[in-house]
Amino acid sequence: MKQISADNFKKVLNINTIGPALVGKFFLPLLDNKNPSVFGFLSARVGSISDNKLGGWHAYRASKASLNMLIKNFAIELARTNKLAKVIGLHPGTVDTDLSKPFQKNVPDNKLFTPQFSADAMINVVRGLKDGDSGSVFAFDGSKIES
């Protein structure tokens, strides 16, 4: 809690919540309503309130929880005009990037993914979506992440 700062909180919310909200605002209405389509937002498991067992990462967790609510809202609103579109969140897993470097030592060997593995896994999730999945957040392995 000591590390919370207003400036950092605003920065993280701008990147992880407000940016995606504006992307959704302008692009979701453009989805074809005559053919099935999927709009996926990059979310994270740490945005799940019920899955939070460790605390910490206050701004990041709050920004992703907020994004997950937007995903649900967008799915509900889009379904009123486009029954064939799905709006989902995708958790890529822990990907070997600069962002994950500080905590990679705590990640099990088989749970640190290459960007290519993660991208392929998320594409497979999209391919396996079913009716009723819009508004949900899915992990790279296809499991649904609870709110």
Predicted feature residues:
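Catalytic loop of short-chain dehydrogenase/reductase
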Residues: M1-I18, L28, D32-T81
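Short-chain dehydrogenase/reductase
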Residues: G24, I71, A119
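Conserved Rossmann-fold SDR core element
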Residues: N68, L78-V95, D133-V137
